[in-house]
């Protein structure tokens, strides 16, 4: 059985839209890449898939070597299969599809992106761990994660600061408080 781990990169003020603030080298970058080693695959929604699939297949280097061959699972109400970039479309209800994947796969399933799909999975209690890679910058305008109505309590399981100033915050969800 797989655990579902959400992993996202953000600024101190919560901006997840990657910009000039992103620090892409050093010990934290290796640690971020290593979270995919031995995983069952990547999980993402349509918007994240379209952005990543439009970029990574033509890239080379350590990140590309790690990400390109990995199995990817994509939830979408509008995409139709077959998908490119070693990706499989989750058919039908996304939450039920993720439950099936968690039951069938061996190794962590890493969820990339913090939009509507991630929020839905968090509200359904399907995310086992959240990893926030917080970069030492405040960026102001931009997309923020988990904009929604539900309130979720988290328990900190690790905080690690790297030489670059990037901090990894690992949490487990504890309770969802309805409105």
What label would you give each PLM region?
Residues 1-179:
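Enzymes that bind and transform nitrogen-containing heteroaromatic metabolites
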């Amino acid at each position: 059985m797989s655990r579902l781990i959400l992993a996202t990169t953000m600024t101190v003020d919560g901006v997840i839209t990657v910009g000039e603030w992103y620090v892409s080298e050093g010990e934290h970058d290796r640690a971020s890449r290593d979270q995919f080693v031995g995983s069952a695959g990547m999980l993402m929604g349509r918007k994240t898939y379209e952005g990543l699939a439009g970029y990574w297949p033509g890239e080379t280097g350590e990140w590309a070597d790690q990400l390109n061959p990995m199995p990817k699972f994509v939830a979408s109400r509008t995409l139709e299969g077959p998908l490119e970039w070693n990706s499989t479309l989750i058919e039908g209800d996304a939450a039920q599809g993720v439950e099936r994947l968690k039951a069938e796969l061996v190794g962590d399933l890493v969820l990339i992106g913090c939009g509507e799909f991630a929020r839905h999975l968090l509200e359904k209690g399907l995310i086992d761990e959240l990893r926030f890679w917080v970069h030492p910058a405040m960026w102001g305008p931009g997309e923020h994660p988990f904009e929604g109505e539900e309130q979720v309590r988290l328990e900190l399981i690790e905080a690690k600061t790297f030489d670059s100033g990037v901090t990894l915050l690992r949490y487990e969800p504890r309770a969802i408080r309805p409105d």
